[in-house]
């Protein structure tokens, strides 16, 4: 019996189970609130003088996603409207913001069960080349 074929079959089976599972847990926006960046008092001459000023300007200097209210999310995040009217950062690019305004789902997934789960988009297919 060829053990390498059994091992490869086992790995492929695990990958397929992970890819075709019916749901994925959604990301909660509760702890992902962001600070509004409408304060334009940052002076270029002194923005790196203290640790505090460096923390305040770090996201501005290294590519950020600007939300409709002017707040910023780290690069490759998605701005989602939160239930309190502010914006929160979903930590995945091109995410789906759920209608409950408390969760988000990764790209190519849709919100289900009120936003508690993420389901693969209809018609989503995976192909494996040999």
Curated annotation (Swiss-Prot):
GO terms for cellular component: extracellular region. Keywords: Disulfide bond, Secreted, Signal. It is found in: Secreted. Residues 1-26 form the signal peptide. Granulins are disulfide bridged. Pfam families: Granulin. The keyword Disulfide bond applies. Disulfide bonds join 67-79, 73-89. Belongs to the granulin family. This is Granulin.
């Amino acid at each position: 019996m060829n053990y390498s074929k059994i091992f490869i079959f086992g790995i492929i089976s695990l990958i397929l189970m992970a890819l075709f599972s019916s749901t994925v847990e959604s990301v909660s926006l509760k702890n992902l609130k962001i600070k509004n960046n409408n304060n334009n008092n940052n002076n270029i001459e002194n923005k790196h003088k203290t640790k505090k000023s460096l923390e305040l300007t770090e996201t501005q200097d290294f590519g950020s996603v600007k939300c409709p209210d002017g707040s910023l999310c780290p690069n490759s995040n998605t701005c989602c409207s939160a239930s309190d009217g502010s914006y929160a950062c979903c930590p995945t690019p091109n995410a789906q913001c759920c209608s409950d305004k408390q969760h988000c789902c990764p790209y190519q997934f849709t919100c289900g069960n009120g936003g508690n789960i993420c389901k693969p988009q209809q018609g989503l297919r995976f192909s494996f080349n040999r």
